[in-house]
């Protein structure tokens, strides 16, 4: 199963390249990058073909992925896929990955087709790693790149393997066992687990 680090390694490896898919005739579009990574790189089998970026939150919901809408204070977690509105410039929206949260509150993103080349809507662009600032009104602007700001709509999260969650679950189960022992034996106080058994002190 794919880990978060697997995804981050993959999207970083594609920076400055053009990511395309066989179902999109318009070259390196922003959504083609997402579809390339989520369907064709061996990480996931999530189909984001034949869809504009603006509709990807709906597609994600159809694929049973966790979808979150921007509420003025939250922000896309690392490795989430965010969606923005590009009005009034065009109605197709924009999409990319959140690659890192920075100490100054900015977000490093990896996204495609932000070079503003004249044929961007017909042939797309390249994958770029940039820094953005997210304001409370949803304005998602570039810090180190020349391109128009957009409005953040929301994001979706991917089904990663999570060993830390499994470890926490095990610890909670141990706590339940400990509580059960105390209730059955009428004992209170401290104890330890040794070899899977609870020993009262």
Residue ranges and their predicted role:
Residues 1-201:
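Extracellular cell-wall/glycan-interacting regions and their flexible linkers
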């Amino acid at each position: 199963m794919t880990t978060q680090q697997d995804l981050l390694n993959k999207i970083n490896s594609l920076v400055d390249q053009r990511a395309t898919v066989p179902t999109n005739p318009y070259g390196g579009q922003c959504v083609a990058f997402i579809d390339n990574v989520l369907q064709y790189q061996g990480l996931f089998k999530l189909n984001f073909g034949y869809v504009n970026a603006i509709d990807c939150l709906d597609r994600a919901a159809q694929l049973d992925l966790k979808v979150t809408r921007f509420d003025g204070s939250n922000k896309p977690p690392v490795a989430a896929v965010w969606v923005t509105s590009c009005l009034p410039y065009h109605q197709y929206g924009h999409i990319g990955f959140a690659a890192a949260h920075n100490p100054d509150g900015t977000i490093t993103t990896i996204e495609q087709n932000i070079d503003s080349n004249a044929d961007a809507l017909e042939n797309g662009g390249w994958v770029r790693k940039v820094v953005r600032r997210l304001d409370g009104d949803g304005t998602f602007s570039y810090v180190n790149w020349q391109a128009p700001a957009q409005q953040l709509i929301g994001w979706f999260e991917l089904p990663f393997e999570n060993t830390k969650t499994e470890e926490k679950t095990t610890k909670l189960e141990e706590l339940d066992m400990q509580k059960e022992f105390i209730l059955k034996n009428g004992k209170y106080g401290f104890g330890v687990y040794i070899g899977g058994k609870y020993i009262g002190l």
